[in-house]
């Protein structure tokens, strides 16, 4: 399964990365003056008064290959900022999504919006790294973590001032996310094991989530009809990547979506 391959590669990459700096090393770096103070990701999505948009900087995916050939992460992020969306998601996974931590570092330098680090986080080391490179929130995928890890990772992220988008795909994962105390729940409409997409997954899980949580619908949002459907369901936010990456004009596509 592709998810198993991604995690296996992530473990190999992490072993190399962790050999150059320890968690203690990250802790010291985080204390340096001038390090970005995390923004309120939850507040940006919940208090918008309308459905919020998290726009993603995404070059490729395992299911689609290269999505955007003329990929300029800084230009894309600037267009997002100018389009008055609520948050930006930056893919940093290198092997399968062609992302890079450096994209986030550079976008952080000019971006006034909360930034979500989208990666496969399986070790505390990555959480400290995320804080140092400028993330305001991190993605935690429930299916990759034990109950203990899910709770501990959120606690550590919160202590560091960051928030977590806790991603689920089915009822059991949602139950685990809620039990862990997750405040921002991402419902992935894509099954990460088969890569099949069904927007109705959001509808199926939504009514099980308390009103004080932020609900984010992720994957498969292609047009204004999809957005209208999700808005009528009452989701707080949508995470959109591929649709914006394939658009002839990102800003025009966002304008269309915001008019819904």
From Swiss-Prot:
Q: What class of enzyme is it?
A: lyase
In which pathway does this enzyme or protein participate?
Answer: Amino-acid biosynthesis; L-tryptophan biosynthesis; L-tryptophan from chorismate: step 4/5
Its keywords, alphabetically, are: Amino-acid biosynthesis, Aromatic amino acid biosynthesis, Decarboxylase, Lyase, Tryptophan biosynthesis
InterPro entries, per the entry: Aldolase_TIM, Indole-3-glycerol_P_synth, Indole-3-glycerol_P_synth_dom, Indole-3-GlycerolPSynthase_CS, RibuloseP-bd_barrel
Q: Name one GO molecular function term.
A: indole-3-glycerol-phosphate synthase activity
Q: Does the keyword Amino-acid biosynthesis apply?
A: yes
Q: Quickly give the catalysed reaction.
A: 1-(2-carboxyphenylamino)-1-deoxy-D-ribulose 5-phosphate + H(+) = (1S,2R)-1-C-(indol-3-yl)glycerol 3-phosphate + CO2 + H2O
Q: Which Pfam families match?
A: IGPS
Coiled-coil stretches are none
On the tree of life, the source organism's domain of life is Bacteria
Enzyme Commission number(s) of this protein: 4.1.1.48
Its GO biological process annotations read: L-tryptophan biosynthetic process
To which protein family does this belong? Belongs to the TrpC family.
Q: What is this protein called?
A: Indole-3-glycerol phosphate synthase
Q: Which organism is it from?
A: Acetivibrio thermocellus (strain ATCC 27405 / DSM 1237 / JCM 9322 / NBRC 103400 / NCIMB 10682 / NRRL B-4536 / VPI 7372)
Upper lineage ranks?
Bacteria, Bacillati, Bacillota, Clostridia, Eubacteriales
Task: Name the gene.
Answer: trpC
